[in-house]
Amino acid sequence: YKSDKLDDWKRFADRLNAVAEKLSRCGVRTGYHSHAHDHQPVEGQIPWEIVAENTDPRVILQLDTGNCMCGGADPYAVLTKYAGRNQSIHLKPYSKAAGYEPAIGEDDIPWEKVLSWSENEGRTEWFIVEYEMDKAPVSAIEKSIRYLRTLRPL
């Protein structure tokens, strides 16, 4: 979702709540995946925070670590602000110098902090490794998995 109006974001949160209510009756969970623009101010407020603070706790906040950092936010700080809402996280690398090009472990995201908190306090159930670039994606995913295995046995 994207809008440059605060009221639109609040209406979007209302729509997420309505969908979550309907789908929860069927045993289906609803969530929102973050984009870079979700972490950039709209009328002085951060859209990700508007969504988080105006949705039912059963709405999953699926943080994308790379998009979060690209948008100017600290993925670790964003995760810890909304404990219990990040049942799944997209582990996407991002470097301020090289953008989305580096593999996980060659970027600027504090992976040890992100993983440790997510596993222990965050109640994260799924970690999805994602690579944004077309440049050698298989090689980048292999490097990313190797690095993640140095932090945690998979």
Residue ranges and their predicted role:
Residues 1-60:
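Active-site acidic/histidine proton-transfer and metal-coordination neighborhood
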Residues 42-60, 67-154:
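Histidine-acidic metal/acid-base catalytic patches
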